[in-house]
Swiss-Prot record:
<dbReference type="InterPro" id="IPR014746">
    <property type="entry name" value="Gln_synth/guanido_kin_cat_dom"/>
</dbReference>
<feature type="binding site">
    <location>
        <begin position="164"/>
        <end position="168"/>
    </location>
    <ligand>
        <name>ATP</name>
    </ligand>
</feature>
<keyword id="KW-0418">Kinase</keyword>
<dbReference type="GO" id="GO:0004672">
    <property type="term" value="F:protein kinase activity"/>
</dbReference>
<dbReference type="Pfam" id="PF00217">
    <property type="entry name" value="ATP-gua_Ptrans"/>
</dbReference>
<feature type="domain" description="Phosphagen kinase C-terminal">
    <location>
        <begin position="14"/>
        <end position="242"/>
    </location>
</feature>
<dbReference type="GO" id="GO:0005615">
    <property type="term" value="C:extracellular space"/>
</dbReference>
<comment type="function">
    <text>Catalyzes the specific phosphorylation of arginine residues in proteins.</text>
</comment>
<keyword id="KW-0067">ATP-binding</keyword>
<comment type="similarity">
    <text>Belongs to the ATP:guanido phosphotransferase family.</text>
</comment>
<protein>
    <recommendedName>
        <fullName>Protein-arginine kinase</fullName>
        <ecNumber>2.7.14.1</ecNumber>
    </recommendedName>
</protein>
<dbReference type="GO" id="GO:0046314">
    <property type="term" value="P:phosphocreatine biosynthetic process"/>
</dbReference>
<keyword id="KW-0547">Nucleotide-binding</keyword>
<dbReference type="InterPro" id="IPR022414">
    <property type="entry name" value="ATP-guanido_PTrfase_cat"/>
</dbReference>
<dbReference type="InterPro" id="IPR023660">
    <property type="entry name" value="Arg_Kinase"/>
</dbReference>
<feature type="binding site">
    <location>
        <begin position="195"/>
        <end position="200"/>
    </location>
    <ligand>
        <name>ATP</name>
    </ligand>
</feature>
<dbReference type="InterPro" id="IPR000749">
    <property type="entry name" value="ATP-guanido_PTrfase"/>
</dbReference>
Length: 339
């Protein structure tokens, strides 16, 4: 399975990665929010022993109460864990496979949240891998399940299959034409959700968006995936149409934006987190339009490792704001200079 950060993808592919999550609870235990600290940590140990024996490759557990903040947040940047897991760090943990494509969050909103993330637009591969692991675990434990409601979860929106499917997608042309809000409203009407991958004060930046299903009750896993695929394919089609319009009407402006961004990234001494993300979006746009020849795995690595927490975790030291901006620019220059 392809790690979305390291694997090379089609340069014209505007879907960054695909993600499938399954929420599960153990029948004999209270929900995670009802467990005290001792009970929650016992649950971590119990689940880890099961998961460890079912993962064929090497796995590693991270108990959040024992881990460095920047290390934890670096896995949030890689999209392997959730903000909800971090909020209850005295009770939570997560397990990763060696490829960092499978994550098992323990005591998040539910006892288990199984997540698989893979490169590009490939929901089927993510689904196949996560269901295989889920089936193995289900043979070892009793999941909380109701014949009418399906898998029982803390959130009513996860009842049924307990599955969330999502893709992260790059939409600079739709954003440029102020069409994001219209598409977001349209997706909501068909049971989908669309939000910015990176936000500052509830305002999205970087042209990266997450599209996911909102409801699982009454739908099969296959129906959820098919519905999401249909919605995403429509968004991709519209994004490409708007790109053609931009290249026809604003060719020089687009080229200037792309090459100006590349020039700044290859020469800047200081880069803030937000500015870097926005410039990387412009360069990614240039790659997708065949204006620049840069590998997607390079851009994905930069997207992740230029986040404040990931950069500090990579350098293994805490940095002031000025040091962060200096080291970020230095890191970007070094990666882009590689053959």
């Amino acid at each position: 399975m392809k790690n979305w950060i390291n694997e090379e993808c089609n340069k014209e592919d505007i879907v960054i990665n695909s993600n499938i999550s399954l929420s599960r609870n153990l029948k004999e235990k209270p929900f995670s929010n009802k467990l005290n600290e001792i009970e929650a940590r016992e649950n971590v140990g119990f689940i880890y022993q099961i998961v460890k024996s079912e993962l064929k490759d090497e796995s590693c557990i991270y108990q959040l109460w024992n881990e460095d903040k920047e290390l934890i947040n670096s896995y949030l940047d890689k999209q392997l864990i959730s903000k909800e897991l971090i909020k209850n760090k005295d009770k939570t943990a997560f397990v990763l496979n060696s490829e960092e494509t499978l994550s098992i969050m323990i005591n998040e909103d539910d006892h288990l949240k199984l997540r698989c993330i893979t490169a590009g637009f490939d929901l089927e591969t993510a689904f196949d891998n996560i269901t295989k692991l889920d089936d193995k675990i289900e043979k070892r434990v009793h999941y909380a399940f109701d014949e009418n409601l399906g898998y029982l979860t803390t959130s009513p929106t996860n009842l049924g299959t307990g599955m969330r499917a999502s893709v992260n997608i790059h939409l600079p042309a739709l954003n440029f034409n102020d069409e994001i809000s219209n598409f977001s409203k349209g997706l909501t009407q068909i049971g989908m959700d669309m939000k910015g991958l990176y936000e500052e004060g509830n305002k999205a930046y970087g042209n990266m968006y997450k599209i996911s299903n909102q409801v699982t009750l009454g739908l099969t896993e296959e129906e959820i995936i098919d519905n999401l695929k249909g919605a995403v394919l429509n968004v991709i089609s519209e994004e490409k149409k708007f790109r053609e319009v931009l290249l026809t009407k604003c060719k020089y402006d687009i080229e200037d934006k792309v090459f100006r961004a590349y020039g700044i990234l290859t020469s800047a001494i200081l880069l803030s987190e937000k500015e870097c993300t926005e410039l990387l979006s412009s360069v990614r746009f240039g790659v997708e339009l065949s204006l620049l020849d840069i590998s997607k795995n390079k851009l994905n690595k930069l997207l992740v490792y230029t986040r404040d927490s990931s950069l500090q975790n990579y350098l293994k030291r805490k940095l002031s704001n000025k040091e962060l901006n200096y080291e970020r620019a230095k890191f970007v220059r070094a990666i882009l200079a590689q053959n």
